[in-house]
A protein has these predicted regions:
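Short alpha-helical "packing" element that flanks the helix-turn-helix/winged-helix DNA-binding module
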Residues: 9-16, 68
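Hydrophobic two-helix hairpin corresponding to the core of helix-turn-helix DNA-binding domains
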Residues: 10-13, 25, 62
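Short helix-boundary/capping micro-motifs
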Residues: 15-30
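Helix-turn-helix DNA-binding elements, focusing on the entry/boundary residues of the two helices
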Residues: 21-22, 40, 54
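Alpha-helical residues within the helix-turn-helix
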Residues: 27, 38, 45, 66
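Residues within the DNA-recognition helix of helix-turn-helix
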Residues: 32-42
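A short LG(V/I)-centered, amphipathic sequence patch enriched
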Residues: 44-61
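Interdomain hinge and pocket-entrance segments immediately C-terminal to HTH DNA-binding domains
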Residues: 88-94
Length: 94
């Protein structure tokens, strides 16, 4: 996979993984369940692997999904930290 996977799809995947539910993740993100599902499916298609194991009752991580989550969660945390630092710097007079 190239590095051009949409960040929104990665964020969608992380939310589904953390909530273990498309419905709860969609509610947390303020998007429809179908839009969230399409985003994750597109990410899986782009990567060529299944990230999530879906059943009628729950959503779990595949082995690939668990490894991917560990890697991207740290990256997303760094992005959040960068925004927080910029917000702090902006509120301090120069």
């Amino acid at each position: 996979m190239d590095a051009s996977a949409p960040l929104t799809a990665v964020v969608a995947f992380v939310h589904v993984a953390e909530h273990a539910s498309f419905t709860r993740a969609a509610d947390a993100l303020g998007v429809s369940t179908s839009a969230l599902s399409q985003s994750v499916r597109a990410l899986e298609a782009r990567m060529g692997v299944r990230l999530l194991q879906r059943t009628t009752r729950r959503v779990g991580l595949t082995e690939h999904g668990a490894r991917f989550l560990l890697r991207v969660r740290g990256g997303l945390d760094q992005i959040d930290q960068a925004f927080a630092e910029l917000d702090s710097a902006r509120s301090v007079p120069a």
